[in-house]
UniProtKB/Swiss-Prot annotation:
Gene that this polypeptide is encoded by: Fam151a
Protein name, as recorded: Protein FAM151A
Pfam families: Menorin
Keyword Cell cycle: no
Annotated membrane topology: Single-pass membrane protein
Protein's organism: Rattus norvegicus
Length: 608
């Protein structure tokens, strides 16, 4: 009996021990499974985006990490260098891992060629690049950004990346970063050699996104300069001919002040984007971030920022009902035109100005569009000349009061200031500069005039050089909108006239919209619009209508000639009846393979 009891007791213990062991195994399996699921998530299935040179947003959208192509949705982990930090990063829900690469024992007697994960001044690490990549590739789908702190680490690291890619193991975007130019406030040169860095990438691992940056210094309590036009242009020149996608890392606290340069930079190629980063103690302004957000496409800017700035910014940025502030020198996209949208979407509007005794009252348009202001000059009895708008009844309205009246409305507008007499140019620009400084110009602004230059010199019009010089000196943050004198257009826009206008605008950093009359354009060489648009990535053409001596057929030939070249970069300053007919005609013939300059079949309003 005692034996049975002993055996029974022993059996019970083994059963209990077995149950506990099974429970423990199941628990461990579940934890490992959940961890592995958290790390891997759905795999990347589309070969077009599952590659080192893929667009980061396309990749993250493909694997279900983001819902649409918006750099604000991407999350980052900084300095995932040591094995402890790497594990923490891998177990987090961030989308892109950022880590620093140098060589072991950098600049000491113990230096080797082994790439390790460390940020200066550290020159040793418990993690080599090879170990880091093995861990990241085996247990996550996270994007990779490698920041190279020394040129010596670049070659061996790219060799390793190439080997892993050729083995089919790197199926995600890889960004290769280095600071290759001396930037703001830096007293000594510490940057990686630009020529050698870019050459190594082309030679050893060209299938990646390049992230070339500036060395920077920012001290909150001291005066700080920002990125200059020369810096930005030098950087763009270095990467212009490269085939890769390029994302420029820019210090967020300095970016708003240099926005005119970055607006220009982003317009130079669809391959370009910015990655805004924040130093640990940088006082980044949410207002500045919102301005940058408002004046760029969502896919053009990544935001690598600290809390609480990131959450505060994201909450406001994703609020679709907030009032936005646009850069005066920026594009009509997205203010009035959708990205890649038809320029015909943009409507030119006129203010309704009513005479009331000696004063004029404004009735603002009830819809969004480009507001055309024809500006002259009034010589007061005392004081400086004042730029004004004149009414049919003889009253005058100052340009400043008009713009202030428009600024209080929430409607999206852009402003086209058309200078009608030479003496009004600089006073008008001074008014624009003053209001912009006060924050009363929250939209894109065009400044245009009929210019006199070369073979189209006509007395009474603004000298072409004076228009560009005045803009550069008084208020450069505008789109320049030059037109040819009507007196010279009897035979259309002849090649010499187009060539001379392009010569006049050579070196212009502002966007330019060449103003073309529809009638004369219909009599011009077929390549006229194409030549003007080829002037720069920011060049556009505005076709306008003048009733003076133009046949109906010539007008519509001009409109269709412009549409045949490019529908996103051509605008139409034409009367409402023409615009309605053109819209209706476009709708009736969409889609159409007949897009040549001569395709004017069935002019609106014309019997066939």
């Amino acid at each position: 009996m005692s034996c049975k009891k002993c055996c029974s007791s022993s059996q019970t213990k083994w059963i209990l021990a077995g149950s506990v062991s099974m429970t423990l195994v199941l628990a461990i399996s579940m934890i490992l499974g959940l961890t592995l699921y958290q790390r891997t998530r759905p795999g990347c299935e589309n070969d077009a985006v599952c590659r080192p040179d893929a667009d980061m947003l396309d990749y993250l959208q493909n694997i279900g990490q983001i819902s649409h192509r918006d750099g604000l949705l991407v999350t980052w982990y900084h300095a995932a260098n040591s094995k402890k930090e790497m594990e923490a990063a891998l177990n987090s829900d961030v989308m892109v891992l950022e880590a620093d690469v140098t060589v072991e024992g950098f600049n000491t007697a113990n230096e080797t060629e082994v790439p390790i994960m460390a940020h200066p001044p550290a020159i040793y690490s418990d993690n080599t690049l090879k170990e880091w990549l093995e861990a990241v590739l085996a247990s996550s789908q996270k994007g990779i950004k490698l920041d190279f702190k020394s040129l010596k680490a670049v070659g061996p690291s790219l060799d390793l990346l190439r080997q892993l890619t050729e083995a089919g193991r790197i199926r995600r975007p890889v960004w290769i970063n280095a600071d290759i130019l001396k930037g703001p406030n830096v007293p000594i040169s510490t940057e990686v050699n630009a020529t050698q860095f870019l050459a190594l990438v082309q030679e050893k691992y060209p299938k990646a996104t390049i992230s070339p940056g500036f060395t920077t210094l920012y001290v909150h309590q001291l005066p700080n300069s920002t990125y200059t036009q020369a810096m930005v242009e030098t950087m763009e020149e270095l990467v212009r001919a490269l085939p890769q996608k390029v994302t420029f890392p820019m210090r967020a606290v300095m970016t708003r002040a240099a926005w005119p340069h970055f607006s220009w930079l982003l317009s130079q190629s669809e391959r370009y984007s910015l990655t805004l980063w924040q130093g640990a103690s940088d006082p980044v302004s949410v207002e500045d971030l919102l301005f940058i957000r408002d004046n760029s496409a969502p896919h053009q800017i990544y935001y690598d920022l600290f809390e609480p700035v990131l959450s505060q910014f994201k909450q406001l940025a994703l609020n679709t009902t907030r009032k936005r502030t646009f850069y005066t020198g920026g594009s009509l996209i997205p203010v009035l035109q959708q990205p890649k949208g038809d320029g015909l979407e943009v409507e030119w509007l006129a203010l309704e100005v009513n005479d009331k005794g000696r004063k004029a009252a404004i009735t603002v348009p009830d819809r969004e569009g480009m507001i055309l202001l024809d500006v002259g000059l009034q010589e007061p009895e005392v004081g400086n000349p004042v730029p004004v708008l004149r009414t049919p009844g003889g009253s005058v309205l100052t340009l400043e009061s008009c713009l202030l009246h428009l600024a209080v409305h929430a409607t999206r507008w852009s402003i086209h200031v058309n200078i009608t007499e030479p003496a009004a140019l600089r006073p008008s620009l001074a008014t624009l500069a003053h209001l912009s400084t006060l924050g009363h110009l929250p939209w894109p602004v065009w400044v245009g005039a009929t210019v006199s230059y070369g073979s189209f010199v006509v007395p009474g019009h603004i000298a072409g050089r004076e228009l560009l010089t005045a803009v550069a000196e008084v208020f450069p943050h505008v789109t320049v909108a030059p037109a040819w004198p009507e007196e010279m257009l009897g035979s259309g826009y002849q090649e010499q006239m187009v060539t001379e206008m392009l010569e006049l605008c050579q070196g212009l950093r502002q966007p330019v919209s060449f103003q073309l009359q529809a009638g004369p354009l219909g009599q011009s060489p077929a390549n006229t619009v194409a030549r003007l648009l080829a002037f720069s990535p920011r060049a556009t053409v505005t076709v306008y209508h003048s009733s003076a001596g133009n046949s109906y057929a010539d007008v519509w030939a001009g409109l269709w000639a412009a549409r045949a070249v490019d529908r996103t970069r051509v605008y139409y300053r034409i009367p409402q009846e023409y615009r309605k007919d053109l819209l209706a005609h476009v709708d009736r013939h969409r889609p159409s393979s007949r897009t040549g300059p001569s395709y004017v079949e069935g002019f609106p309003g014309e019997s066939r």
